[in-house]
């Protein structure tokens, strides 16, 4: 079931890729993908290219994929291990969701962080109290690690 579904998603992704994202298997392993997300132009991540790994569980799509950033990113919902705090990757997952939708959700998280459900409280605090400093730091990290 899982590998058939993953094959179908790969076909759909190749046919109709989401804006500013690409993804596909690493080598022959259909359960391990790498994705590339372009930093949204209306965010401090503009111009950055962010690598993301995707691991599908054997019971996909009934369980969410494990998705993590490999590129360092300064963001209240992404920690230094690359873990992403995103409801659809946890309790709001639904088998109706696809990798394409997950990648789009991550893109919009880059544009609109959720400081009320942070993975990194210090960055969330900066986002809420000193937006200018947050954006400058995020821009600096993007230039340093994602370009």
UniProtKB/Swiss-Prot annotation:
BP term (GO), one = protein ubiquitination
Protein name stated in the entry: Ubiquitin-conjugating enzyme E2 5A
Q: Which domain of life is it from?
A: Eukaryota
**Record field: catalytic activity:** S-ubiquitinyl-[E1 ubiquitin-activating enzyme]-L-cysteine + [E2 ubiquitin-conjugating enzyme]-L-cysteine = [E1 ubiquitin-activating enzyme]-L-cysteine + S-ubiquitinyl-[E2 ubiquitin-conjugating enzyme]-L-cysteine
CDD domains (alphabetical): UBCc_UBE2D (cd23792)
Q: Does the keyword Translocase apply?
A: no
EC assignment: the record states 2.3.2.23
The EC class name is transferase
Function description: E2 conjugating enzyme that associates with the E3 ubiquitin-protein ligase EL5 to mediate ubiquitination of target proteins.
Q: Which GO terms describe its molecular function?
A: ATP binding; ubiquitin conjugating enzyme activity; ubiquitin-protein transferase activity
Which cysteine-cysteine pairs are annotated as disulfide bonds in the entry?
none
């Amino acid at each position: 079931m899982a590998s058939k579904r993953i094959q179908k998603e790969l076909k759909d992704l190749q046919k109709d890729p989401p804006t500013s994202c690409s993804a596909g298997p690493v080598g022959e392993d259909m359960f391990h993908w790498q994705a590339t997300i372009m930093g949204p132009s209306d965010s401090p991540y503009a111009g950055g290219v962010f690598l993301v790994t995707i691991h599908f569980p054997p019971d996909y799509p009934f369980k969410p994929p494990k998705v993590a950033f490999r590129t360092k990113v300064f963001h209240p919902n992404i920690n230094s291990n690359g873990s992403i705090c995103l409801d659809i990757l946890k309790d709001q997952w639904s088998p109706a969701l696809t990798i394409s939708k997950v990648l789009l959700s991550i893109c919009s998280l880059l544009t609109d962080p959720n400081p009320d459900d942070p993975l990194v409280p210090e960055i969330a605090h900066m986002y809420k109290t000193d937006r200018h400093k947050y954006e400058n730091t995020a821009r600096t990290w993007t230039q340093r690690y994602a370009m």
